[in-house]
């Protein structure tokens, strides 16, 4: 990638509550920056998720990192609910990166827009904000806390800006007209 060495990670497993939180929590704990992701849940209950993550500065052996991520993430996903309930870490292998000068001087005003889909069976949540370490993990924890189910997502990091789109559903999103 332009910013450094990265990994493409595919996760194919039976969907489970808090699976997305567990995956994002792992990446956050290891200071792996999610640059791009596609999240899909099949009608038959399987999660097919792909991520492109950047390694932190100081990580040198790409093959060793890939093997480590493959092993550790597989172990974590054996019990995604327990992994999701672990406290967010501040560190990882190489510490946390600081906010860039550009994002401090020209921050992106956070925006969130929630709209029903065409059939009104799910919702489309669009989030735009300044990128920061742990942002996607924080969003995933909010989804889990409010029992919002993630059906599909497209995650994009464009420099210091994130543009994420989530297709979600859940009982807290149901509305009634009184």
Where do the model's predicted regions map?
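Short beta-strand-to-loop capping motifs
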Residues: 11-15, 53-56, 127-129, 168-172
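A short, glycine/Asx- and small/polar-enriched loop/turn
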Residues: 5, 44-49, 160-163
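Conserved small/polar residues in nucleotide/adenosyl-binding loops
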Residues: 175-178
């Amino acid at each position: 990638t332009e910013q450094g060495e990265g990994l493409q990670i595919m996760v194919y497993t039976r969907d489970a509550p808090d699976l997305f939180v567990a995956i994002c929590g792992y990446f956050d704990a290891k200071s792996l920056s999610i640059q791009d992701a596609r999240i899909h849940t099949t009608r038959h209950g399987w999660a097919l998720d792909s991520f492109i993550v950047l390694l932190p500065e100081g990580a040198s052996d790409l093959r060793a990192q890939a093997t480590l991520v493959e092993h550790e993430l597989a172990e974590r996903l054996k019990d995604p609910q327990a992994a999701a309930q672990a406290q967010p870490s501040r560190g990882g292998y190489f510490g946390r990166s600081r906010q860039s000068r550009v994002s401090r001087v020209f921050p992106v005003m956070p925006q969130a827009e929630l709209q029903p889909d065409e059939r009104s069976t799910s919702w489309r949540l669009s989030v735009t904000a300044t990128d920061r370490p742990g942002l996607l993990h924080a969003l995933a924890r909010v989804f889990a806390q409010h029992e919002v189910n993630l059906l599909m997502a497209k995650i994009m990091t464009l420099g210091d800006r994130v543009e994420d789109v989530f297709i979600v559903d859940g009982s807290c999103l149901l509305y009634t007209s009184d």
